[in-house]
Amino acid sequence: MASACGAPGPGAGPGAALGSPAPAWYHRDLSRAAAEELLARAGRDGSFLVRDSESVAGAFALCVLYQKHVHTYRILPDGEDFLAVQTSQGVPVRRFQTLGELIGLYAQPNQGLVCALLLPVERERELDPPDERDASDGEDEKPPLPPRSGTSVSAPLGPSSPPAAPEPPTPAVESAPNGLSTVSHEYLKGSYGLDLEAVRGGASNLPHLTRTLAASCRRLHSEVDKVLSGLEILSKVFDQQSSPMVTRLLQQQNPPQTGEQELESLVLKLSVLKDFLSGIQKKALKALQDMSSTAPPAPVQPSTRKAKTIPVQAFEVKLDVTLGDLTKIGKSQKFTLSVDVEGGRLVLLRRQRDSQEDWTTFTHDRIRQLIKSQRVQNKLGVVFEKEKERTQRKDFIFVSARKREAFCQLLQLMKNKHSKQDEPDMISVFIGTWNMGSVPPPRNVTSWFTSKGLGKTLDEVTVTIPHDIYVFGTQENSVGDREWLDLLRGGLKELTDLDYRPIAMQSLWNIKVAVLVKPEHENRISHVSTSSVKTGIANTLGNKGAVGVSFMFNGTSFGFVNCHLTSGNEKTARRNQNYLDILRLLSLGDRQLGAFDISLRFTHLFWFGDLNYRLDMDIQEILNYISRKEFEPLLRVDQLNLEREKHKVFLRFSEEEISFPPTYRYERGSRDTYAWHKQKPTGVRTNVPSWCDRILWKSHPETHIICNSYGCTDDIVTSDHSPVFGTFEVGVTSQFISKKGLSKTADQAYIEFESIEAIVKTASRTKFFIEFYSTCLEEYKKSFENDAQSSDNVNFLKVQWSSRQLPTLKPILDIEYLQDQHLLLTVKSMDGYESYGECVVALKSMIGSTAQQFLTFLSHRGEETGNIRGSMKVRVPTERLGTRERLYEWISIDKDEAGAKSKAPSVSRGSQEPRSGSRKPAPAEASCPLSKLFEEPEKPPPTGRPPAPPRAAPREEPLTPRLKPEGAPEPEGVAAPPPKNSFNNPAYYVLEGVPHQLLPPEPPSPARAPVPPATKNKVAITVPAPQLGRHRPPRVGEGSSSDEESGGTLPPPDFPPPPLPDSAIFLPPSREPLPGPGVRGRSGGEARALPPPKAHPRPPLPPGPLPPGTFLGEAAGGDDRSCSVLQVAKKLSEVDSAPPGPGRCLLLPGPLELQPARALPSDYGRPLSFPPPRIRESVQEDLAEEAPCPQAGRTGGLGEAGMGAWLRAIGLERYEEGLVHNGWDDLEFLSDITEEDLEEAGVQDPAHKRLLLDTLQLSK
């Protein structure tokens, strides 16, 4: 039996002998998903392993494979520390002293398990030999600290502890640092007996022990004398009178000869030293107070000084006008916009031809909205309030996109400063990370604090504006904690005149994180928590690990993680494991959310540090690319980007585009040379230049966060790493108010679920339930077990809950705050109560009188484990729905610039007039264009649903794409990608591009839905229907005899997939649209335009068998399982992306009766590493100009495509980039261009200038 199961017989389990190794079938810290994967590889019935339980501390989980399904049994300890397999009610319980006994019994047949335990699945071997240290690439190695306390030391295998044995303790005398151990040993060996005899004879002292102590402390006499002598000199600086006792002791040359007298003298000296130290402090204090009383009055304390005032900033702009306006006002006008943040005013100064000036002043409350242009990165629309609540919009062209961003930041700061709200809607956060190389920092680190240097930096007019929160993460920081904190506070005070308050400081070895906030925010911070995790050998030794801080800012939770991961080019897998260990073991945030890892526990989580991911490229190629400032090829081989694409680390995290050179490994004292050679005893070590120092973040869905800068300094050269900075604009919520104090008659909000369906990556066939957590709930709620489940594939399980199984949730918060709340869901099994996946759903889009759809992914322990969708509604009384516009919603993105010239500007989304509820939609509206279907704001439906709360404006894309200078045109024929939602995180987005064949089935209509008439600037978009029998899941092997073998781990056909890349809306023109009732919006209103295709879409999956090693359970080539769970589903539904033929429109078929889902990232099916290129054209214009549909009549002017065609026609296409960059992007505006304007755009040749002007004159 022992040979079969790998365990000793009863009574001889691993816990019976303390030094025995752990049995092969036991896997410490193995996740449930990894256990199922190991068993799937084993592939034989009766394969088993034992792992730690994820739900109960001290318990175990026995996993058994039978008929390709994994069965899990919980092994629980009882009150007497016996172990027993959890059984159904009425089944007798068998108790065991050790796991070995338990496994030995159940290895026999017919013992109550699904099958006997036959084949133990052993642990995988370590990726790296245990003797290899982290600092394999030459980083400074710190001496390892002793292990953690005994609570974390492995215990022997027994009823309640994992099977491992601790090392026997080393006697203390062996580690004693001085010679006292020898003296003690001699006394105990010889003189001890003499003292014992003396005591027995009636002696009252121990002469031999006294002599031993006196001999041991003899050197201390001279040391105390030296200290007393030095302190006496220091004392005379403040007081001329010296201490007579100290003088007498120092003049005493001959110490007593007897041991007892010698000890008495030493004790006297120590007593005098203690009093002398305190006396010196009192003398110094008195002397300094006397000096200050005679000195002139001291200035006001710096802590009471206000922050430096922000000077008035001026911006040179041009007024962007239409051709019709130009005929009235003549030449294009130039303005100076002066922003007075302190005074709350914006002054528009216009210079007239006769040198006169005309200016208009607008107070902060009369600036209603800022509208950023997608097409022109330096163009901004400003909506001003005129008399009688009328508004006027003016469009300005700034010198550069960076100036436009600075102007927007100043106006937001002005709005915030003069807001009537008691609590802020938005704060700014600075994140800094720096590996200091075990060297003290230079005196001046201002460039780090002010985000100056290389990459995406702040404009000079905004760098001095203090941030609300500063977070500094350092590695290899040899400065003491208090000294480091004082250095940071001093630097910030010198820079801002503010005394920043330290909120938290956490250290692990030389890894530190410090958080400082403005004094005005100190009372808004609560629930501060700190934690640390060691990731060295056995997660105990070494100098690598992570520290973290979390807190609440009013009602918004923040988490910050600073880490130092394993170094070495070849240690990618170990770095990945470091990340997963930190994710699982770092204890931060609300303890009630222990079922969720820290990536889901916070509204905003920032993760930064020396991640140590390297570049997989030859050193000379890397240096060549860096010298040419070409970073795109290097980012393609960046290990962190590659691992994120494979969904192995930082799942759904975001990172701003990298536009600065690698920050490691520089020659100390310079930023001109990379020191990529390191001489070591084992040979020469190569450290290729790499972006080791990174800042990433992850935020809850429908929250506001924008990265304003991401770069590194170029003037701090003490370390071989450059400091990295990032600044963020983050939306925050007010402190929530409990509803318990309200009257009982007050209307109550509640959350109802109609149905939920989850696809879970598992080979188990157990039942499941859902737990619901939220700060708006008094306690967590749970559903009943699912009432339906099915599986078309062995490695995926679809589970469903109807409304009868789902609870009704009753929030305890005031209704106004619900739109800022989120629900956290975890899907757990009934057999082991272990989580199979967690997710977050925002309530903002769910508020309304009708049910709304959500769809999002599930993850567990940092790995993607499936997805979940459902129908729910958050019912809120209309009269109590909070609709206050947030400050960050004040800036929006112009989505329809072509039509904006002829329409009155919208002041804000929340203030739009609702559509009349009496008008019945026309039949054609059922299949109208999707121009409104996936847009953020909703108009109230005829059913009387209250208007949805306003959302934040979409955030602008990075200003400069990789390898493309500012102002460079996009490639012709390639549409620009849509803008990212301002809820700028990849954890949530409106569902777009979902293949129709995977949406809920609907009875076919006998007649094709009529094509709607095109509205202004909109185009009908449809997706051809699939021909029956054409779309089959691709087969893994042609010769497979069973469905399960041929399917591998393909998901079931109705697996709800992530949205395809936007290019999937362009399909071959040969297929016919599916007859159906058409497309409907969320509330039966207008449809909305789908976004255009990505500028660089991924190629579709080629037909034929999928590559081997892609799916779970198959032998992969190497250990790279890069295909994520939801990519598996995507591969089943990938479609061709050829553009439509001439004259053909794309129609989306009818089965969109379900409301559009709202909880998936817009880039769900593509890697998150590389931000899309710059947006050059609005969504509707792209579709209107590029889709040759007869319904899509154009009303806007020619865009960039028209400009390019005109320049090519006259042979001057070389000037297109310069003209567009300077705002001349439309032929309608060119009629007013002058020679001066042409020169500014780069046209210097007189002949070319004359040709351009003559051609424009002829075209009038």
UniProtKB/Swiss-Prot annotation:
Residues 25-121 form the SH2 domain. The keyword Plastid does not apply. It is a peripheral membrane protein. A motif (SH3-binding) lies at residues 946-951. Residues 159-171, 940-952, 998-1013, 1050-1061, 1090-1108 have a biased composition (Pro residues). Activated upon translocation to the sites of synthesis of PtdIns(3,4,5)P3 in the membrane. Enzymatic activity is enhanced in the presence of phosphatidylserine. A motif (NPXY motif) lies at residues 985-988. Its main location: cytoplasm. GO terms for biological process: establishment of mitotic spindle orientation; immune system process; negative regulation of insulin-like growth factor receptor signaling pathway; phosphatidylinositol dephosphorylation; regulation of actin filament organization; regulation of immune response; regulation of protein localization. Gene3D superfamilies: Endonuclease/exonuclease/phosphatase, SH2 domain, Transcription Factor, Ets-1. It comes from the Eukaryota. Expressed abundantly in skeletal muscle tissue. CDD domains: INPP5c_SHIP2-INPPL1 (cd09101), SAM_Ship2 (cd09491), SH2_SHIP (cd10343). It catalyses: a 1,2-diacyl-sn-glycero-3-phospho-(1D-myo-inositol-3,4,5-trisphosphate) + H2O = a 1,2-diacyl-sn-glycero-3-phospho-(1D-myo-inositol-3,4-bisphosphate) + phosphate; 1,2-dioctanoyl-sn-glycero-3-phospho-(1D-myo-inositol-3,4,5-trisphosphate) + H2O = 1,2-dioctanoyl-sn-glycero-3-phospho-(1D-myo-inositol-3,4-bisphosphate) + phosphate; 1,2-dihexadecanoyl-sn-glycero-3-phospho-(1D-myo-inositol-3,4,5-trisphosphate) + H2O = 1,2-dihexadecanoyl-sn-glycero-3-phospho-(1D-myo-inositol-3,4-bisphosphate) + phosphate. The modification Phosphothreonine is found at T960. PROSITE patterns: SAM_DOMAIN (PS50105), SH2 (PS50001). The keyword Chloroplast does not apply. Tyrosine phosphorylated by the members of the SRC family after exposure to a diverse array of extracellular stimuli such as insulin, growth factors such as EGF or PDGF, chemokines, integrin ligands and hypertonic and oxidative stress. May be phosphorylated upon IgG receptor FCGR2B-binding. Phosphorylated at Tyr-988 following cell attachment and spreading. Phosphorylated at Tyr-1164 following EGF signaling pathway stimulation. Its EC number is 3.1.3.86. Keywords: Cell membrane, Cell projection, Cytoplasm, Cytoskeleton, Hydrolase, Immunity, Lipid metabolism, Membrane, Nucleus, Phosphoprotein, SH2 domain, SH3-binding. GO terms for molecular function: inositol-polyphosphate 5-phosphatase activity; phosphatidylinositol-3,4,5-trisphosphate 5-phosphatase activity; SH3 domain binding. Phosphatidylinositol (PtdIns) phosphatase that specifically hydrolyzes the 5-phosphate of phosphatidylinositol-3,4,5-trisphosphate (PtdIns(3,4,5)P3) to produce PtdIns(3,4)P2, thereby negatively regulating the PI3K (phosphoinositide 3-kinase) pathways. Required for correct mitotic spindle orientation and therefore progression of mitosis. Plays a central role in regulation of PI3K-dependent insulin signaling, although the precise molecular mechanisms and signaling pathways remain unclear. Interacts with tyrosine phosphorylated form of SHC1. Interacts with EGFR. Upon stimulation by the EGF signaling pathway, it forms a complex with SHC1 and EGFR. Interacts with cytoskeletal protein SORBS3/vinexin, promoting its localization to the periphery of cells. Forms a complex with filamin (FLNA or FLNB), actin, GPIb (GP1BA or GP1BB) that regulates cortical and submembraneous actin. Interacts with c-Met/MET, when c-Met/MET is phosphorylated on 'Tyr-1356'. Interacts with p130Cas/BCAR1. Interacts with CENTD3/ARAP3 via its SAM domain. Interacts with c-Cbl/CBL and CAP/SORBS1. PANTHER family: PHOSPHATIDYLINOSITOL 3,4,5-TRISPHOSPHATE 5-PHOSPHATASE 2, SH2 DOMAIN-CONTAINING PROTEIN. This is Phosphatidylinositol 3,4,5-trisphosphate 5-phosphatase 2.
